[in-house]
Amino acid sequence: RNSAENMLVEILLSDQQCWKHLLEWEGEITPRINVIIQVSREILSKNLHLTPTNLMREISTTDTNEELNRWISELAMKDISHLAQEKRELIFQDCLKKIHKICICEKLDDIKKQMTTKKNNGLQYHQELETLQTLLFELKKE
């Protein structure tokens, strides 16, 4: 998960064309990537460029967690310019798909735990079962 997130953000910070793909992404994402998406939309609404500096500045005004800014700062220092544009786009799409799959698997684990708890307490778990089936179907589409 971390390696996919890291590579995704490294590419984002070095390639402006990938922002559009991320902002249009409809799959599952991690909480950190979700914050980046929300903040990037704020930046764009102010007619600013999506740069590491603007991203970190906007995050610091909306999120008190310095860990996210530190993470972005570290990734912004990495040089991936040696990768060809096509290769970067392919890796970016692969990272999005991997993050999507990981998030679905994490949700599946959570639903299974909820079902087990309800089963052990003698409660109905039909809603969890439906959610589980939906997630399994989504995972199978991958």
Model-found features: residue ranges?
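Bacterial replisome coupling helices
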Residues: 45-142
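Non-catalytic protein-protein interaction segments used by genome-maintenance enzymes to assemble
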Residues: 1-49, 72, 105-108
